[in-house]
Amino acid sequence: MEPVQKLQIPYKSIRLSDGTEYQSYHTEGALSGKQPADYKNGIPAFRKEWIQKRFNHSNHSQMYFAKKGIITEEMRYAAFRENMEPEFVRSEIACGRAILPSNRNHPELEPMIIGKNFLVKINANIGNSTFSSSIEEEVEKLHWAIKWGADTVMDLSTGKNIHETREWILRNSPVPIGTVPIYQALEKVKGKTENLNIQIFLETLEEQAEQGVDYFTIHAGVLLRYIPLTTNRITGIVSRGGSILAKWCQAHHKENFLYTHFDEILKVMKKYGVSISLGDGLRPGSIADANDKAQFSELETLGELTQLAWKEDIQVMIEGPGHVPMNLIKENVDLQTKICQEAPFYTLGPIVTDIAPGYDHITSAIGAAMIGWYGTAMLCYVTPKEHLGLPNKEDVKQGVIAYKIAAHAADLAKGHPGAIDRDNLLSKARFEFRWEDQFSLSLDPETAKTFHDEMLPQDRMKTAHFCSMCGPHFCSMNLTQELRKFAQEKEIQES
């Protein structure tokens, strides 16, 4: 086994004033989340030698190697990041309970694993629209998202220069990149849904896979017979990909071509080692529509497609809702686990109430924490701009932070090894009034420090045994320390 130090596992070292050092899971890559001086230089091709060793294989999926009993360098790397044994990572990938997204043409990738027995991961969406954003802005959004902790990023560009934008996102990304290929396929037919066909879609898949995309969202579960089931919904079909395929099905009175040609899609996946994220094109777009027949009928089909992909050794994760009230969340996980035989669940939130536009990073983080606790492997973030507009940098940060909180809360509830260590260190620093250590251990040190310093900016206040909330005479922790000191002195005197 290759020594850990030679693998250069990307941890962030947090040194505390009491001499303690905490190693934090780190997603920022070689540039530590900073914007490159010139995005056209890209970042180092980290996996180049690993990929070359396996170049002659006909199947480049990590599941293919895992089923053969081979522990790849990527598996070993992901295992060390998780503090797990490499054999455990291999076995989880082999049985389909976890995926390691890693296109052979994305050598810049620092491998990570998605599965319910590992740390809960989060995805951030970026991408331009017809109204705004340049390539430079999207690369900047990428680095901004991973600076705050995004484990994967999806490029959902629908505007100009889709190919070139994706190319430079990939060349600058240390995290897996996902896309929804139907968007670019639609752009190729100038937005005319009825002109889509399997040839155009496969050409688009090949183009994106050749660039290095690590996972594709494929809405192959939107079947012709399911479309009428959405008629009485309040919000109908809210998935962009789902609505595109539904419109095509109705225009031609034919079955979804992604479903009927799924075997051809798998051939592209196998060639490049791309993972499939089976899209929930009929997910509920309002809590009134949650857990309805349309949603769960599609889920049954996704279970069928999962088996087809696994037969070809293709890695699969299943996308989920959406908008779901808290009392219906567990049913989603239980059904997905049963129908899709524990393939990793990847959910958008879910949003638990529809009354808070502008705050849906909060309404969804509540649902995300719950669904992560129940076993969801990856959470797709929601920003404050959800339902309102294209998110800017600050929106991306707020979304990522909200979801890092949700994911960590789920890890704590699941009892993931080591998850509580950071909480304990921060609590100890808080009780001992080590303010700088509190800032360093927080998910957002800049905001924590800013809030503290608003009222108490002086350097001497960095060691003060109070904050501006309670002042020097009403701090419960300071009073507790005095009580303990008094009790210890009394005990010494009596002994």
Swiss-Prot record:
Keywords, in A-Z order: 4Fe-4S, Iron, Iron-sulfur, Lyase, Metal-binding, S-adenosyl-L-methionine, Thiamine biosynthesis, Zinc
Enzyme type, top EC level: lyase
Gene3D superfamilies tied to this protein: 6.10.250.620, Radical SAM ThiC family, central domain
GO biological process: thiamine biosynthetic process; thiamine diphosphate biosynthetic process
GO molecular function: 4 iron, 4 sulfur cluster binding; carbon-carbon lyase activity; zinc ion binding
A GO CC annotation given for this chain: cytosol
Reaction(s) catalysed (UniProt annotation): 5-amino-1-(5-phospho-beta-D-ribosyl)imidazole + S-adenosyl-L-methionine = 4-amino-2-methyl-5-(phosphooxymethyl)pyrimidine + CO + 5'-deoxyadenosine + formate + L-methionine + 3 H(+)
Source taxon at top rank: Bacteria
Pathway given in the UniProt record: Cofactor biosynthesis; thiamine diphosphate biosynthesis
A Pfam family per the record: ThiC_Rad_SAM
Residues involved in substrate binding: N125, M154, Y183, H219, S239, R240, G241, D280, G281, L282, R283, E319, Y346
Cofactor(s) it depends on: [4Fe-4S] cluster
Binding residue positions for Zn(2+): H323, H387
Cofactor note: Binds 1 [4Fe-4S] cluster per subunit. The cluster is coordinated with 3 cysteines and an exchangeable S-adenosyl-L-methionine.
Binding site for [4Fe-4S] cluster: C467, C470, C475
Enzyme Commission designation: 4.1.99.17
Family membership: Belongs to the ThiC family.
HAMAP family membership: ThiC
Listed NCBIfam families: PRK09284.1, PRK13352.1, thiC
Described function: Catalyzes the synthesis of the hydroxymethylpyrimidine phosphate (HMP-P) moiety of thiamine from aminoimidazole ribotide (AIR) in a radical S-adenosyl-L-methionine (SAM)-dependent reaction.
Name this protein carries in UniProt: Phosphomethylpyrimidine synthase
Protein's organism: Leptospira interrogans serogroup Icterohaemorrhagiae serovar Lai (strain 56601)
